[in-house]
């Protein structure tokens, strides 16, 4: 059975935090995708949109790259620490 946003959203803190951190830096999704590519993470626009929309889970490699690019801690993205 496929999870819907409201079902997945309670278990996916990372997406909302990535979205907030990206916007705080004034970065567009396209810019974040380009930086992910530079860091060896292959994600397309749909994947990032689904991640930020809390529809898609993040991998460990993506999590570390996102934290580095957005200049936040992995703990912040996981909801375990304030920014």
Feature map (PLM): residue ranges:
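A detector for short, charged/polar N-terminal pre-domain segments
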Residues: 1-13
